[in-house]
């Protein structure tokens, strides 16, 4: 559902005068078992947002809870496209996925037409720990991904952990002092994630429930759906900044 929300938001922001403009190239990559695969039914590759907008995708309804500053809760019925189904069973080849995405991003950034573009944003949405590599290998692979970029900056690697565990305080774009280091997976995600650029700090402050000083880490842990929606909107905010 999170993937669907992201794609829907990008299609919405690419709509100008009832026409979908080619503002984004998107790749949807899944990973489970021993496989890393395209969620668009072909080889792993970038596709223009215009192509995704033309596809017919099943939609499901869900309820989004929103708290006001007065403490009141409002439930909003929403719909989202189902571009991907969760694959919580079996292994989680996260290292293999990062390596595949790194090759994809490297090829995209090397094209002359992309050289001066806003750098790629990579969202890793996970509900578990990697099964194919340890801490050092994952961190090294993530840093290699972040080293690739355009003349406008380096690739932003955003890690989103989704969990039903309610024992820990949810965090979104935390600073270094807010990451629960006692939770191994959160510590790993912190070390794998990019530091958010200063140009996006005003939006990050809007997303967070309380103020904290930068630098902000490109990750979330146990965030609510409304927080995830705000976090994923960083992609459309990046478009505005890049124009």
Outline where the language-model segments fall.
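Acidic, low-complexity intrinsically disordered regions
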Residues: 1-243
């Amino acid at each position: 559902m999170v993937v669907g929300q992201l794609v829907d938001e990008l299609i919405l922001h690419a709509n100008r005068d009832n026409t979908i403009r080619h503002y984004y190239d998107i790749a949807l990559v899944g990973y489970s078992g021993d496989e890393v695969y395209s969620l668009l039914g072909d080889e792993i590759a970038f596709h223009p947002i215009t192509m995704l907008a033309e596809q017919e995708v099943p939609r499901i309804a869900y309820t989004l809870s929103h708290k006001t500053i007065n403490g009141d809760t409002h439930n909003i019925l929403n719909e989202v496209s189902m571009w991907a189904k969760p694959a919580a069973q079996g292994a989680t080849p996260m290292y293999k996925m990062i390596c595949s995405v790194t090759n994809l991003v490297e090829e995209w950034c090397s094209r002359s037409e992309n050289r001066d573009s806003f750098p790629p944003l990579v969202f890793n949405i996970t509900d578990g720990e990697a099964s194919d590599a340890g801490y050092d290998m994952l961190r090294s692979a993530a840093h290699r991904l972040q080293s690739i970029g355009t003349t406008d900056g380096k690739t932003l690697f955003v890690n989103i952990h989704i969990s039903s565990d309610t024992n820990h305080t949810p965090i979104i774009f935390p600073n270094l002092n807010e990451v629960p280091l006692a939770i191994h997976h959160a510590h790993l995600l912190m070390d794998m994630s990019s530091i958010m650029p200063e140009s996006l700090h005003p939006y990050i402050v809007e997303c967070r429930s309380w103020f904290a000083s930068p630098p902000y880490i490109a990750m979330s842990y146990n965030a609510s759906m409304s927080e995830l929606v705000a976090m994923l909107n960083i992609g459309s905010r990046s478009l505005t900044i890049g124009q």
